[in-house]
């Protein structure tokens, strides 16, 4: 897949997401947006010898993920969306997550993501998963 095909694919996905909306008020029209353009950005590719990652999203570390770093935790009280929101049990179990903006030292290469998908998060709906992956950005921390 060429870069231009990837960018077009990504733009199409964001346009669809923009029409659908994001967040808990999307059913009332909140969270919608328009995509005016997408350009490739290599801002994070120019980091020399990264030894840590910055998480751009809240996440739950997977076994074996780095533990040394600076971070804050939060409790996410999730609610199901779409057709599940109207069920008798629309809430997810509370989930302890690492907040976006956290930084963790790594040994070796920085991976594209950390964390994992959480199963058994909605008692009445075992098919529901909670996205708990970190979008990681390589950074260089001083010793």
Regions found by a protein language model. Give the residues of each.
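Basic, Gly/Ser/Thr-rich N-terminal segments that form RNA-phosphate-binding interfaces in CRISPR RAMP
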Residues: 1-143
């Amino acid at each position: 897949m060429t870069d231009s095909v990837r960018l077009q694919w990504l733009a199409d996905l964001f346009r669809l997401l923009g029409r659908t909306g994001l967040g808990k008020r999307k059913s009332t029209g909140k969270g919608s947006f328009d995509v005016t353009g997408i350009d490739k950005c290599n801002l994070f590719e120019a980091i020399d010898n990264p030894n840590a990652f910055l998480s751009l999203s809240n996440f739950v570390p997977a076994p074996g993920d780095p533990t040394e770093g600076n971070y804050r935790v939060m409790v996410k009280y999730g609610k199901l969306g779409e057709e599940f929101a109207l069920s008798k049990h629309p809430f997810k179990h509370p989930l302890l997550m690492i907040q976006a903006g956290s930084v963790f030292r790594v040994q070796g290469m920085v991976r594209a993501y950390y964390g994992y998908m959480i199963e058994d998060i909605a008692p009445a709906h075992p098919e529901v998963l909670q996205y708990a992956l970190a979008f990681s950005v390589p950074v260089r921390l001083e010793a």
